[in-house]
Amino acid sequence: MTPTLRRKLEALAERREELQHLLSDPEVVSNNDKFRSLSRELSQLEPVALAMQEEARAKADLSAAEAMRNDPEMRELAEEEILAAQARLDELDAQLALLLVPRDPRDEGNLFLEVRAGTGGDEAAIFAGDLFRMYARYAERQGWKVEIESDSPGEHGGYKEVVARVVGRGAYSRLKFESGTHRVQRVPATESQGRIHTSAATVAIIPEADDVEEIVINPADLKVDTFRSSGAGGQHVNKTESAIRITHVPSGVVVECQTERSQHANRDKAMKRLKAQLVEAERSKAAAAEAQTRKLQVGSGDRSQRIRTYSFPQGRITDHRVEGLTLYDLPNIIEGDLDALIARLLHEHQADELARLSEGT
């Protein structure tokens, strides 16, 4: 471990002690919001503290074993214990380094998934449908809930656009690297000559804003339109203008919801999405400024960035953000088996963050 990382660990240990003192302060105890916030911070530091305690024990074991090595009768046993202690220290060193990677407070939360057909006409809409189905299948495997908020079906299948809310613990942490342009190479079902076509769809992953991130929206900045829903809900939705479209005039952000039977329920859902979009827009500005000073290999969240190619003739998926990340398992991945792909992206992100921490930036 580099000296820079070691200093950061020591700073976290000091912060933990400080938090323990603060949480026993009557003034803090009487302030529910502050107490809850500090308690959450302390709980996040516990894994670091436990690993550092384990490291101290392993160092003590190593010192004891090295002392035994001077005794001829104990030398063989000492050598074994030295090797075991060194292996444990190496393991803890890697574990502590990963614990230093900043934890995104949004990781455990829900998200909004937006998939839009790009270039490629009908085939792009069909591919957008395939991508949405892939994420829905993955969510089902994770035990998450997928709620479609609005959709615009393609003429020959798939979607011109579909927006859904994904509800489940850790949803954002697993899908946050999916934002960007996804490209497909395959022979469309509508192609009679057997030629391979290239088309694209864009994906946006937007974390749901929580109560702490509540922002104030001036009602005068909103343009609200109602229209007849084309979504689910039976005949009722086509008879009344229950669907809602809200435009935030200053930013140009537009959200729709048409899945609920009442206009009020659709408005509540649309406002929730609007708040999430505006919070994420502010974060994106900050991330763009940060990206000027360091390279972000994974997770920039830019939906215009081409991140992945799905080549059906070769049965492979290539992620262009990570060198050498090509998987020849397209049939299973497109059916929602994303674990191997997501694991590689998470590993790359952690390595990127550790490199940044080691540089002290």
UniProtKB/Swiss-Prot annotation:
<comment type="function">
    <text>Peptide chain release factor 1 directs the termination of translation in response to the peptide chain termination codons UAG and UAA.</text>
</comment>
<keyword id="KW-0488">Methylation</keyword>
<dbReference type="InterPro" id="IPR004373">
    <property type="entry name" value="RF-1"/>
</dbReference>
<keyword id="KW-0963">Cytoplasm</keyword>
<keyword id="KW-0648">Protein biosynthesis</keyword>
<dbReference type="InterPro" id="IPR050057">
    <property type="entry name" value="Prokaryotic/Mito_RF"/>
</dbReference>
<dbReference type="InterPro" id="IPR000352">
    <property type="entry name" value="Pep_chain_release_fac_I"/>
</dbReference>
<dbReference type="Pfam" id="PF03462">
    <property type="entry name" value="PCRF"/>
</dbReference>
<dbReference type="InterPro" id="IPR045853">
    <property type="entry name" value="Pep_chain_release_fac_I_sf"/>
</dbReference>
<dbReference type="GO" id="GO:0005737">
    <property type="term" value="C:cytoplasm"/>
</dbReference>
<dbReference type="Pfam" id="PF00472">
    <property type="entry name" value="RF-1"/>
</dbReference>
<protein>
    <recommendedName>
        <fullName>Peptide chain release factor 1</fullName>
    </recommendedName>
</protein>
<feature type="modified residue" description="N5-methylglutamine">
    <location>
        <position position="235"/>
    </location>
</feature>
<comment type="similarity">
    <text>Belongs to the prokaryotic/mitochondrial release factor family.</text>
</comment>
<dbReference type="GO" id="GO:0016149">
    <property type="term" value="F:translation release factor activity, codon specific"/>
</dbReference>
<dbReference type="InterPro" id="IPR005139">
    <property type="entry name" value="PCRF"/>
</dbReference>
